[in-house]
Amino acid sequence: MKNRVFSLAMLSGSMDDAIIIPFLDGLVEAGYQGVCPHPRNGLKVPYPSRLYWQRLARFIELAQARGLEIWHYDEFPYPSGQLGGVLVEDHPHLASQTLALETITAAPDANGFIDIGRGTLVALARCRLDDKSTFKAIHDVTADTGMHLDSWICNEAHNLGYTATTHIHREDHERAFPKRISRYYAPETPLQDNEILIAIKATPGNANYQGLHKPDLTRPEVTQFFADHIYTQLSQIGAAHHLANTPIFQDEVTFYSSFPWNEEIHQTLRSQWGQEFAGNLLALFNTNIHGWENARFQYRTLCADLLEKNWYITIKEHCHRHQLQMTGHLPGEETFGGHAQIIGNAFKNLRHFDIPGYDIISSTLPDDIDRCHATGIKLVQSAAWIDGRKPTMAEAFGANGFHQDLQRNRTVLAWLGVHDIKQICDHATFSDSRSLTKYDAPPIHNRFNPMHKGAPDLWKWFQWFCDLMDQYQFDPQTLVLFPFDALTLFTLQEKQWKAQTSLLESFFHYLCAYSLDCVFLPSHQLPEVKATADGFIFQGHHFSHFIIPPFSSLHKSTFEALQQWQQLPGFCWVLPEDTTGITLFGEDHPKSTFIPITAAQIKNCSEDELVKTGANWFADMLDSPLHQWQSPRSVIKSLRINPQNQEKLLVIINPHDDPIEITAPYFGAPLPQPPEHCAMEIITEKDISKVLLAPRATAIFRHQKSTSIKINSPTYRTITPEKCQWRIAGDNFWNVKKGNLHLESHTQIPFATKAVSALWTLTPNATHPQFDYHPLPRQLKLEATFPLHLNTIIPSLSLILDLDSMPRGARWFWDEYELPHTIRDIFETQNNVYDIPTSLLTAGAHQLHMSATIENGAQGILERPILQGDFVIAGEYPLHLDRRSHQWQDAKSTFPHWREVGFPEAFGPAEYSCDFIIPDLTTGNILLELPSCIGIAKITLNGQNVGRNNWEPRLIPLPKVLLHDGRNTVQITLHGSWNNIFSRLNYRENGLHQMPVLRVHTP
């Protein structure tokens, strides 16, 4: 069955027929093909009692009678659910634990002993630091710790009235020695001023939703408990209802701790590390410790292996014995601050899932997809391709708001790129969440929509999604090495590592956002890649480029495998952040070795090749900041560099056709480079250095101080005319409904951030573009010409068209010049971007010409052709709200105007206007309360300017001298660089998001 839409049914309430039957009927009516029962908070049937299994069997029976397919999504037995918490309540020794560091500051007592406090001690390290707080020596002194007898609780019979050494009363003894158990360190020699004690202790892991502790999934007895209590019952219900191979969907399996710990991990690492045990544990937290890469690699690998052995393999074998199939989300790992991330080689656990493939989870992503989710999505996508599995999308609509998730998941699809994601639609896909709670029941989950009968908009969206995916064909061109052994990735919650990882992390995020045709290659499969004269072969597929990210450390075997390809065309090793080299680690490297890598060795691609392959990551970081990145909508203001008193390299590539200005308090001299690669001018004003970097040029700087660097890139504004619809009709030609474009000069307005040189207006009665097509047996050649006229020279201009609606392989020309294009993410959709060289933007007549080949009889719509450049928009206002008259009711009352705030489908200034009547000019002062808005708002009263509002909310007084007796008109004109861009997608960020209000203020 194809294109199945499931409802994730929240089993709350009593699960009576009176609730279940209307719910299932509503799903059938709305067009769902399946239902996924999911016990959740608010369930009023004891779980997992016999009554619960009876009610669940009844639910399945009713669903089958209506032709609905059944999956079972049981979060309760998993770590995020309640049953895991109950397990720990009954068996405390099965709770998850995590490592934690504690610096011991207690002074020695009279005997020279140091109190290291309570808690489960794993190791005690005595560390010597240099003047830069770098660890120079670490000694494991755990053997020198023990209980101090004087601190024991004295309630035994022989301690009631005296001790072995003194004859004092019990009360005096307890005052002298409090009732507590503590450990003490007995040093052989006193601590020096440059020495510290660090205790490594095991503490409880994170709690679940209800505050219950979570189980340790590296213990086999935990897995067996879940299997016995849940899977056996599910298999019996499935057999009774002839549901062979009922799928069991696993929720995000995780350690639920940053540094999981138990006896098996302790014993294994103690035997491996010996005398280096305490030092290697400290190295998990701190990169200033010698050998941290190797220690972290061994630790993560051990944890991943235990999770695979004791959870995934055990659960899979149990499911198969009971004719169940296992699938689920990518393992969630809190160590890396994300819902779907990588821990060492735990990514291989995906291969234990049976159906339907690898889940590219979208669920309830935030409005601005964070880099963890985006990278996780891309990695699962690559894993599905590498392993020959089908990508699927579970929880396509999460539980936190159906209509919002409709917008967010379109964003997710954009991140997935061109990876043949139509396969997602060929397999079962969870959809929006429904609660079975009655209307009059207590609000168990306010975010759920109780008794919501179906979702026609979901179904329409899903069908649109299926149709859209028909256009995608995945043909990967670029391999990107993803290092399962470079364990400095995605450590967003660990502040000590963040400075070390931000560069590599941003690089991966950039590739996820912009390199839609790349596949992430696990480092352990590197030997399978074969180099050829024109590219690289992996699993029988050809790749034109192979990108190696800017690693600061690599496993020795990985490094040696890469060295052989350094001179091959298409091979690009991006410059590491540290100029001195790369740290190698491995089994035959007990000590880390620094291997010097020069720029000449690792940067073998020409600048054009870097642009084509997406390796010019820093260039696009001009528009997507390294440390401040939140979404593709962000524009960089400054970039903070912290070299930590070490000389660093800063690589800046200018991808634009105009120079960019770089300003910093200090710049070292640029590295010598051939003139064709570095064209710049350095201007020194007092302590400020300015560098003008020529178009399409690259500069590499040395800098030795922490500095704020300001990079002024061209400010782009994106606009579009009214929606254009080009449709391939049955007569095999393009029918242009609207879309003739015209550019005219315009006077600069006071609040423009740059010189206004042009504006975009529609010419409704202009001649339609001419077309020439040549019928072919199976294909048609499509050509279209658009005349334009520039009354003045403009600084920059780009043509942007949606990939969703572009004819495949379309070529665009500006006059006779073919426009080279890139793929750029403009807000929430991918686009072909055609940059027009500034030398061609002369005043006068021009034409845009498109040439493409299409399938005979195909249908499609080309929406929203966009011009992007340094100009603002004027012309006819795309939005006029109905003007309404209001009478004053109370001099101090607040009354609404602007009955609703709509958002225009076209681009340009949004106008909001309202009429009001003043019966008496002696009324108090009238203030216009304007909410915060994106852009700049210009306010007029009866045609006269009264002020403007920039970003922040404020109260604007309406001058009495401009007020009329009777009718008055207030008009707000909203301009802005982001104003009304893709308004249907970003409706919360366009125009005014709240109603303006007129207030009367009586002194």
Residue map of PLM features:
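Carbohydrate-binding surfaces of carbohydrate-active enzymes
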Residues: 3-6, 10, 14-22, 32-36, ...
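Acidic/aromatic-lined carbohydrate-recognition and catalytic surfaces
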Residues: 38-183, 199-224
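Catalytic beta-strand/loop cores that center a nucleophilic Ser/Cys/Thr
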Residues: 122-155, 159-161, 610-645, 915
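Short aromatic-centered micro-motifs
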Residues: 127, 536, 629, 682-684, ...
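Extended acidic/polar, glycine-enriched regions
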Residues: 149-239, 686-714, 843-845, 854, ...
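C-terminal accessory/binding modules appended to enzymatic or scaffolding proteins
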Residues: 643, 910, 931-933
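Beta-strand-rich ligand-recognition modules
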Residues: 804-867, 932-992
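Repeat-blade elements of multi-bladed beta-propeller folds
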Residues: 925-927
